């Protein structure tokens, strides 16, 4: 991870925005969740978030500016039956974002944690959940471009009104 950030800074330029957007939304009963599955989901969702956030902070602090966005999910707020590994990783990522926001905010770094609550228009949804994809024409599925616009708005916010957490969901998604 250290080498990745150094390479980007050297070859592309200063890193202004980092988006950590990974998750393994696996569905297993708690009795069927193996230690290996639980550990891998946690490593991908929580540990990798920590490593990404730490390295982003290291390059942003000297410039006293930057934005780190950790994408959350409904599971960041509440666990659901069969999603113990995913929910615990997302809970951990949310706590990390809160801690980093408190530590890095005074140093000029905006840390945000948007909650994505709903299906996103992707090939995965089209191929595996056609019934969800059918809701697209009813604005019942999140458009990735619209999510990106909200993330950009987070980055552009003035320091006196930073948003830490917001929910993004289609109008028909219950909450």
Locate predicted features:
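Substrate-binding pocket helix/loop in short-chain dehydrogenase/reductase
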Residues: 29-30, 37-39
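Catalytic loop of short-chain dehydrogenase/reductase
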Residues: 67-92, 98, 102-106, 120
